[in-house]
């Protein structure tokens, strides 16, 4: 449609739903879309380029492989538990179960054959997962913006490439807080009657980015708790008075704002200087 000269605008279905009257059909949907598109405050979804769609497909495929790998590992542990062989959570502990399956007397032959098939599927998923990880790392090394994003603490090749593939242009947001809100890292509001009430994070928007930012921030907070944060720094002050998970989410929010500033101003990341005691 863009090549034909049309002005294409995408609207999230959740914003169109309130304008649908009674029954759902093509005519009612078209009327609701026209009503929603004419609203001056309507938020439109930016159109992604083919390169962004291709990069996003890499992440969707990787997430699918991770979910399938987790499902198979859970099924394998569950089957072995029924015969008295218990393994903790985590793929690394499945090696013990794999070693047990080499012993014909450990479990019945029928169970052993099924579990060996599951282990073969896990090995195949691991190989494909590794291939996609290599592709993501290659993309991050070839992109100058991704290399600049990776200088931010808690952001590696996967998160940097995901930001470029899944996030809209930084100019879509007026400030860093708007970008953090789009990711779903700002408090959910329950305000009324002039009384402001904030709850947990909204968890709206792009959940893949939110998950990656929280995982990266969790690694930063864990390292700071073990090795100690710089005296007078923001993490050191927060960890002294707040739970670690709360600090992790707050750091993810802070990281999202830094990402927006980096993309908007085309600048390199500069570590903040700790305040003097």
Model region roles, listed by residue range:
Residues 1-277:
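A detector of single, family-specific signature residues
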């Amino acid at each position: 449609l863009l090549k034909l000269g049309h002005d294409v605008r995408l609207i999230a279905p959740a914003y169109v739903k309130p304008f649908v009257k009674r029954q759902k059909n093509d005519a009612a949907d078209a009327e609701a879309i026209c009503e929603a598109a004419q609203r001056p405050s309507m938020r439109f979804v930016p159109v992604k380029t083919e390169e962004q769609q291709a990069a996003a497909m890499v992440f969707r495929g990787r997430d699918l492989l991770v979910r399938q790998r987790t499902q198979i590992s859970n099924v394998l542990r569950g089957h072995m538990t029924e015969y008295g062989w218990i393994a903790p959570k985590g793929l690394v502990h499945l090696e013990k179960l794999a070693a047990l399956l080499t012993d014909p007397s450990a479990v019945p032959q029928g169970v052993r054959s099924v579990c060996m098939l599951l282990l073969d599927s896990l090995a195949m998923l691991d190989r494909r997962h590794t291939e996609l990880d290599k592709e993501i790392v290659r993309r991050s090394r070839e992109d100058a913006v991704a290399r600049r994003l990776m200088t931010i603490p808690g952001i590696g090749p996967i998160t940097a490439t995901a930001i470029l593939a899944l996030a809209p242009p930084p100019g879509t947001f007026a400030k860093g807080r708007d970008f953090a809100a789009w990711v779903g890292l700002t408090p959910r509001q329950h305000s009324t009657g002039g009384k402001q009430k904030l709850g947990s994070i909204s968890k709206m928007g792009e959940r893949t980015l939110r998950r990656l930012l929280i995982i990266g921030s969790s690694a930063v907070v864990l390292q700071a708790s073990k090795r100690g944060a710089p005296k007078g720094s923001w993490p050191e002050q927060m960890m002294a008075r707040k739970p670690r998970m709360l600090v992790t989410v707050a750091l993810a929010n802070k990281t999202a704002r830094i990402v927006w500033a980096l993309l908007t101003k085309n600048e390199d990341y500069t570590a903040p200087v700790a305040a003097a005691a």
